[in-house]
């Protein structure tokens, strides 16, 4: 079993569970999940995962605000973050990269591409 740990932050149960299954089966990674940006920040700080998959569109604290807080925190700023988005415009992707995202995955996603992008972020 791979010892790498991935944190998935997404408010949609079905998407979060699908991503968790893909990462566990295809990558052999240990997966933690959070249902909100607030919960994700707490888990990221306490568990210090090797990578984070973060949904942009969430209630309360959206993914971009969560990303900025992760980047501003001395404990979590080194963790690579891959954003999950339904927004595929090039201008959005440029902004996400400028904010510190290591990668961007568009929804709906291909499970093989998801696992490959996580593997690349872990290198």
Where are these regions (language model features)?
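Two-component/phosphorelay signaling modules centered on CheY-like receiver
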Residues: 13-32
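Helix N-cap/capping motif at the beta->alpha junctions
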Residues: 33-42, 63-65
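Active-site beta3 strand of CheY-like receiver
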Residues: 47-53
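A Lys-centered signature of the CheY-like receiver
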Residues: 55, 107
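Receiver (REC) domain active-site loop signature in two-component systems and cognate sites
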Residues: 58
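Alpha4 helix (beta4-alpha4-beta5 surface) of REC/receiver domains from two-component response regulators
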Residues: 65, 88-105, 116
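C-terminal output helix
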Residues: 109-119
């Amino acid at each position: 079993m791979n010892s790498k740990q991935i944190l998935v932050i997404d408010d949609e149960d079905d998407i979060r569970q699908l991503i968790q299954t893909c990462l566990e089966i295809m990558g052999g990674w240990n997966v933690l999940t959070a249902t909100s940006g607030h919960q994700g920040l707490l888990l990221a700080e306490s568990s210090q995962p090797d990578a984070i998959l973060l949904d942009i569109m969430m209630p309360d604290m959206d993914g971009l605000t969560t990303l900025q807080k992760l980047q501003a925190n001395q404990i979590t700023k080194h963790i690579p973050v891959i954003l999950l988005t339904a927004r595929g415009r090039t201008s959005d992707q440029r902004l996400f990269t400028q904010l510190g995202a290591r990668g961007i995955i568009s929804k709906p996603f291909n499970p093989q591409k998801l696992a490959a992008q996580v593997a690349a972020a872990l290198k």
